Amino acid sequence: MRNHHLRRLAGTVAALALMAGAAQAKGKTFALIQYNQQVSFFTDITKGAQKAADEEGDKLVVFDANNSASAQDNAFDTYIQQKVDGIILVAVDPDGIMGSVKAADKAGVPVVSVDAALPPGPQKAGITVDNEAAGKEMGAFYVDYVKKNMDGKASLGVVGALNSNLQLLRQKGFESVTGADAGITKVGVVDGRNIQDQALAAGENLLTGNPKLDTIYATGEPALIGAIAAAASQGRDKVKIFGWDLSAQALAAIDAGTVVAVVQQAPDQEGYKAVKALDTLTSGGKVEATIKVPVEIVTKANVDKYRAAYK
């Protein structure tokens, strides 16, 4: 009888050991190489990625490149040497980073990009919005607003990020629509370089140089926050601003009537889908090469559902 109990106990211990081993084997380590961790859009990507990693029992390590392409290259070297199971990339320089993406692929480390689309290469998937199409959608919204609220005439300035391929696509899409309207006069583009302080200075220069400017299009979160702050600092509360990516500042400006509309992405979903894609890939599965995430134009009419995320 005692031997029977011992055999049962040994079997239970062995089963538990197998279960523990299986759980340990399931957990993977993924590296998220971020653009920066100061802008809420990027931190939301990180939050979504962490949520998916927690669900899958994976470990997520995050590297903040602080807007530096060379830092991202160095991070690739480190994570390849550490033999992580996969890399998620929010690229500062999509073209320049491809050497590192190829090195990771050669080392057997799959790469999934988020936000900025990479050139053709060995990356396994890209998760992003259609930036040019969304720019066109905002352009159509802007033209309709000008017709209904400004007698069909407006002067337009752009606070962009000329170092960002995806923000150039947003600008291109927007201008392809607004440029075809004879009532809209474009006065110029200033470069905020996707850095909030620089976007503020660029926005101030745009407003100072164009005292009759009455509308601004901002192509990203730093550009939008910079444009809002620039208009406030110069007492230009009549200027109507259209842009990308909600923030606490953008919400307050929507309430004040300064910001008319914002293209809102789902960065948390982008990060979430990236980890899920890597988990599928490293388990022998397949994913779509391009995974699109939808956008929504946010105005006073539908902003309330977003408030909780920016308190």
Task: List each model region and its residues.
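A residue-level marker of the well-folded mature domains of exported/periplasmic proteins
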Residues: 2-9, 18, 23-311
